[in-house]
UniProtKB/Swiss-Prot annotation:
It is found in: Secreted. This is Beta-microseminoprotein. Disulfide bonds join 22-69, 38-61, 56-92, 59-68, 83-106. Its main location: secreted. Keywords: Disulfide bond, Secreted, Signal. The gene is Msmb. Residues 1-20 form the signal peptide. The keyword Endoplasmic reticulum does not apply. PANTHER family: BETA-MICROSEMINOPROTEIN. It comes from the Eukaryota. InterPro entries: PSP94 (IPR008735). Pfam families: PSP94 (PF05825). One of its GO terms (cellular component) is extracellular region. Homodimer; Interacts with PI16.
Length: 113
């Protein structure tokens, strides 16, 4: 019960603080896996109820699931013929720049999570 409440608190904090988009997946348990850890999509082990971050996505796991949230908004409506999207992993943001002149930003009409 404590683990479930911890994961719920983590999820609620991420959603409220950042208006994040989250996904919840069932936790797979493998034969050589200890019961007090979980494995991410890259095969890395993490302790239960301990958050980790990779590629601007924050994750945590409990005994039954892995919850991951991201708050990086992506450009949706922009001039796709003349502009390129650049991702900035250091601050989890995107910018849209002119393809011929990358120093010039392009107008973005809408963003999505």
């Amino acid at each position: 019960m404590e683990a479930w409440l911890g994961s719920l608190l983590f999820l609620a904090t991420m959603v409220i603080a950042s208006k994040a988009v989250c996904s919840i997946e069932n936790r797979e348990i493998f034969p050589n896996q200890m019961s007090d850890d979980c494995m991410d999509a890259d095969g890395n082990k993490h302790f239960l109820n301990t958050p980790w971050k990779k590629n601007c996505t924050w994750c945590s796991c409990d005994k039954t699931s892995i919850t991951c949230c991201t708050n990086a908004t992506r450009p949706l409506s922009y001039d796709k013929d003349n502009c390129d999207v650049q991702f900035h992993p250091e601050n989890c943001t995107y910018s849209v720049v002119d393809r011929k002149n990358p120093g010039k930003t392009c107008r973005v009409d809408s963003w999505t999570m």
